């Protein structure tokens, strides 16, 4: 259904596949790639980045969850900045930073988006900030101007 809807990428939570899912992560990655889609792996706030290292050569982006998945409007978890920096530095040191983007999802606000970008965030998911603002277009333009 995602492909039919026009998706150009699919991401999934590594935690959902590492222990109890029927398909191991590598099989899902291959399924996504065979359909000519970009593949991303998502990390919950408490999951260490190290769990993804063995998959880096196969993916296009990492989704760093900056809130616990489940519902919108949660507050940004400040320790996410350190995790983004850790991932960014690792990718730079491995000389693969130009191949893997860092997406940050959850609690992105006008007060913290610059810190997220400075730490290495490439794609910011700012749902509540945008859709609950008086002027969503102005909010997006302000964030994009940075």
Listing of model-derived features with the role each one plays in the protein:
Residues 1-4, 47-59, 106-124:
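Catalytic cores of alpha/beta
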Residues 1-41:
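Glycine/small-residue-rich loop that forms an oxyanion/phosphate-binding "nest" at active or ligand-binding sites
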Residues 3, 26-36, 83-95, 141-144:
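Surface-exposed amphipathic alpha-helices with a cationic face
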Residues 10-12, 39-43, 62-64, 100-106, ...:
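Hydrophobic faces of well-ordered beta-strands that scaffold small-molecule active sites
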Residues 10-19, 63-75, 119-139:
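Glycine-rich phosphate-binding active-site loops on the catalytic face of alpha/beta enzymes
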Residues 15-17, 42-46, 67-68, 105-111, ...:
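Active-site beta-loop-alpha junctions enriched in small/polar residues
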Residues 45, 53-85, 89-102, 139:
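Glycine/Thr-rich beta-alpha phosphate-binding loop at enzyme active sites
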Residues 89-90, 97-104, 109-146:
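Alpha/beta catalytic cores of nucleotide-metabolism and tRNA/nucleoside-modifying enzymes
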